[in-house]
Amino acid sequence: MEGALRRTLNLAKPDDVYNALVDAHKGLSDAECRAFDARLILLLVNHIGDETVIHEALKGAAP
């Protein structure tokens, strides 16, 4: 599915993933949360590896 951002649910256990994200932030300061989020985003961007999809996601996440 290169070049197209998936906008439908693509997780078997989305609640588990959400809870893991929340748990990963527990006990972190605001600055540590931002640093963690930045590292996670960079890891996921590298894993995706498709610049078109990444740019679509950036546009979709913009306020």
Predicted regions and their residues:
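General helical structural elements
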Residues: 10-11, 43
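Residue-level signal for alpha-helical context at structural boundaries
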Residues: 39, 62-63
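N-terminal intrinsically disordered, cationic/polar leader segments
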Residues: 2-6, 12-16, 23, 31, ...
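Short, charge-rich amphipathic interface segments used for partner binding and complex assembly
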Residues: 35-52
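Active-site flanking loop/helix segments enriched in acidic
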Residues: 24-29, 36
